[in-house]
């Protein structure tokens, strides 16, 4: 063991050694809301607070499009199943 490089309890600092970060601070590293950087997605797109809004609008548009597609597909299947 190298002098002066000791962790908690005398273990050498290396793989598995050292002090574990508390869960809240570990979560704050990955979360922009907990880190105090404001409301943003943190993707580096430069959208700021508009990022979550645009993502929500895009998600709603995709969901509406999917529902419309499934409804039309079901109507076409019922129309082709009816005898002419």
From Swiss-Prot:
Q: Which UniProt keywords apply?
A: Biomineralization, Magnetosome, Membrane, Transmembrane, Transmembrane helix
Tell me the disulfide pairings in this chain: none
Is DNA repair one of the keywords UniProt gives this record?
Answer: no
Stretches of the chain forming a coiled coil according to its record: none
**Membrane topology per the record?**
Multi-pass membrane protein
**Location(s), subcellular:** Magnetosome membrane
Q: What does this protein do?
A: Plays a role in regulating magnetite crystal size.
Task: Family membership, please give it.
Answer: Belongs to the magnetosome MamG (TC 9.B.95) protein family.
In the induction comment, the record states: Part of the probable 4 gene mamGFDC operon.
Can you cite an annotated GO cellular component?
magnetosome membrane
Check the record and name the NCBIfam families matching this protein.
MamG
Remarks, miscellaneous: This bacteria makes up to 60 cubo-octahedral magnetosomes of about 45 nm in diameter which contain membrane-bound crystals of magnetite (Fe(3)O(4)).
The effect of disrupting this gene, in the record's words, is: Deletion of any 2 genes encoded in this operon (mamC, mamD, mamF and mamG) decreases crystal size regardless of the protein combination. Deletion of the mamGFDC operon leads to smaller magnetite crystals in irregularly spaced chains, but no other phenotype. Deletion of approximately 80 kb of DNA, including this operon, leads to cells that are non-magnetic, lack internal membrane systems, grow poorly, have reduced mobility and take-up and accumulate iron poorly.
- Which named protein is this? Magnetosome protein MamG
- Sequence segments annotated as region (LG repeat): 41-48
Regions of this protein lying in the Cytoplasmic compartment? 1-3, 62-84
Primary site of residence: membrane
Where would you find the membrane-spanning parts of this chain? 4-24, 41-61
Q: Taxonomically, which superkingdom?
A: Bacteria
Residue numbers on the Lumenal membrane side: 25-40
